[in-house]
Regions:
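Thiamine diphosphate
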Residues: 118, 285, 454-546
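Generic beta-strand/beta-sheet core signal
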Residues: 24, 103, 163-165, 211-213, ...
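Active-site diphosphate/adenylate-binding microenvironment
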Residues: 6, 14, 27, 32-37, ...
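Active-site nucleophile and cofactor-binding loops and adjacent substrate-binding regions
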Residues: 24-27, 49-60, 75-81, 137-138, ...
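Catalytic phosphate/nucleotide-handling subdomain of diverse soluble enzymes
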Residues: 416, 420-457, 464
Length: 582
């Protein structure tokens, strides 16, 4: 019996190790969906179809699976609006370097260019959020396009899009199925002269600081050993937190708007800053000091700040080559100074809201986040929504070397946490997965609670309900504007979840938080814990500029004029202990 092209393409994905496809069915996608059905699902060694409520969630779920496992993940959308819905999640995946393949089905091939019903041009639309995007025009061409898409997604680390007209997908396959060219990613060895230049700069410097990013994955011990030899404090980016914060006696926290601890000051006070595997984009937090950068991606060298020494290579072999060239530093003055400052800041600012607040209502979000860190499993996977939940998880969730924490850190989309958790739970069915959302983010893709219920995924959803878009509110105040348009209508998310069959509870008393977590995490199916948190609690960055102070003061004066002094006083009380003290 003749094989359909759609079946051939699905066989290629199976050969590449794909276990599931996230998406929503639609007429132009029917041949692909039917080919998935014929595989028998994962129970028979085939591919599962994960039916989500919105294609954006399909792309986010695939992004999380790919980001966490490093393996190819797949999503699909029907022609026109269906695959257009993928685009936000695909931006997130591509910016995160996640190997995701998207099948964008298309209108009948003879109608392309005629302004047909639901016509778009996916091969053009997805160019900006992909490393590969091609239109299939014939059955003969299709297997090679699919092969190229697989290799691009895995090899370059990003999104590959195959635009496939439904009528072509239903044609007879014309040749053998090409197998993926499996490979192991090569290690990039740095140029010896560049390493010597870096060693000379380190040996000549009095105060060296390290700032580590996601590129330090797998190099934790080596980075810590470098810090020991040269007496350097280690700051990290949010994406580097998983890989550098744990078991690190030289950790001084994180810089940036979400940052904490002494990282901002340590980076600024150094006379040599070493950027290890980071493409940290916020140049206002990068000083004008002498800077060295190590990265395997040459195009990232020097694009955020001026770099005096650029080393093109992976972090691990770079440190191996660097080690014998270094002269150990006897002085620990700078390192000890930063460690003491970090300890003081963590105690006075970050730790302030985790003490003596067991009876304070509304719930302090920092306290709730610190309890979440204590109760969660040692190998839990956390997915954090963009906004204030990013702050609370960044500051209070400890990675332990066994946990993972992901979010839309480079794209900055709201509503990512819940669909990310879907992909994480399917990738790791035996691990505890915790989605941490604000009410704003959760409500944006609220329908994905149905996806959890339908697939009986034991994701633990934690909702910080403060009835406001907290991060946007903070940004307005810093810019000198009174908060406006940031209110989120009150909704009982626990009641919604219970109606879907979740174990769900709404918590207003902080004394109930820990028990609520434990009960939810012990439940075998999906759960939701809704926390009613203080809407006036704001994230204070580790480094406050004069313009930010002026903007906040201006905004507060407008708040007083518009809503009375009581509102401003209440906001001050909610945040006073968060202000960093030097």
């Amino acid at each position: 019996m003749a094989k359909e092209l759609a079946t051939q393409l699905i066989e290629q994905l199976q050969a590449a190790g794909v276990q599931r496809i996230y998406g929503i069915v639609g007429d132009s996608l029917n041949p692909i969906v039917d080919a998935v059905r014929k595989t028998g699902g994962s129970g028979q060694g085939g591919i599962d179809w994960i039916h989500v409520r919105h294609e954006e969630a399909a792309a986010f779920a695939a992004a999380a699976e790919a980001q966490l496992t490093g393996n190819l993940a797949v999503c699909a959308g029907s022609c026109g609006p269906g695959n257009l819905h993928l685009i936000n999640g695909l931006y997130d995946a591509n910016r995160s370097g996640a190997p995701v393949l998207a099948i964008a089905s298309h209108i009948p091939s003879k109608q392309i260019g005629s302004g047909f019903f639901q016509e778009t041009h996916p091969d053009r639309l997805f160019n900006e959020c992909s490393v590969y995007s091609e239109l299939v025009s014939t059955a003969e061409q299709a297997p090679r396009v699919m092969h190229s898409a697989i290799q691009h997604a895995i090899g370059l680390g990003g999104v590959a899009v195959v635009t496939l007209p439904g009528d072509i997908a239903g044609l007879e396959a014309t040749g053998e199925t090409p197998l993926p060219a499996t490979f192991r990613r090569a290690t990039l060895i740095p140029d010896a002269a560049s390493v010597r230049e870096l060693a000379e700069a380190i040996n000549a410097a009095d105060k060296v600081a390290i700032f580590a990013g996601a590129g330090t994955e797998g190099a934790h011990d080596e980075v810590v050993a470098l810090a020991e030899v040269i007496g350097a404090p280690i700051g990290h980016s949010l994406r580097g937190k998983d890989f550098m914060q744990y078991d690190n006696p030289y950790d001084i926290g994180m810089t940036g708007l979400l940052g904490y601890g002494a990282a901002a000051e340590g980076i600024e006070d150094a006379d040599l800053l070493i950027l290890l595997g980071t493409d940290f984009p916020y140049d206002q937090f990068l000083p004008g000091t002498r800077t060295a950068q190590v990265d395997r991606a040459a195009h990232k060298l020097g694009r955020r700040t001026d770099v005096d020494i650029a080393v093109h290579g992976d972090v691990l072999p770079t440190l191996a080559a660097l080690k014998p060239l270094l002269t150990p530093k006897k002085s620990r003055r700078f390192l000890n100074q930063m460690l003491k400052k970090h300890d003081r800041l963590m105690n006075k600012a970050v730790g302030a809201y985790t003490r003596k607040v067991e009876k304070k209502q509304p719930i302090h979000p920092e306290y709730a986040a610190s309890l979440l860190d204590q109760v969660a499993a040692e190998d839990a996977v956390f997915t954090a929504d963009t906004g204030m939940c990013n702050v609370w998880t960044a500051r209070y969730i400890n990675p332990l070397g066994t946990r993972r924490l992901i979010g839309s850190y480079l794209h900055g989309s709201m509503a990512n946490a819940l669909p990310h958790a879907i992909g994480a739970q399917l990738a790791y069915p035996g691990r505890q997965v915790i989605s941490v959302s604000g009410d704003g983010g959760l409500s944006m893709l609220l329908g994905e609670l149905i996806t959890l219920a339908a697939h009986r995924l034991p994701v633990n959803v934690v909702v910080f309900n403060n009835s406001t878009l907290g991060m946007v509110k903070l940004e307005m105040l810093v810019d000198g504007l009174p908060d406006f348009g940031v209110d989120v209508p009150d909704a009982d998310y626990a009641a919604v979840a219970r109606a879907l069959g979740f174990h769900a509870v709404r918590v207003t008393d902080p004394a109930r938080i820990e028990d609520a977590y434990r009960e939810a995490f012990a439940h075998p199916g999906p759960s939701l814990v809704e926390l009613i948190t203080d809407p006036k609690a704001l994230s204070i960055p580790p480094k406050i500029t004069g313009s930010q102070v002026l903007g906040f003061a201006t905004a507060m004066s407008k708040v007083v004029l518009n809503r009375g002094a009581g509102e401003a006083v209440s906001m001050a009380r909610s945040n006073l202990r968060n202000i960093p003290r030097r």
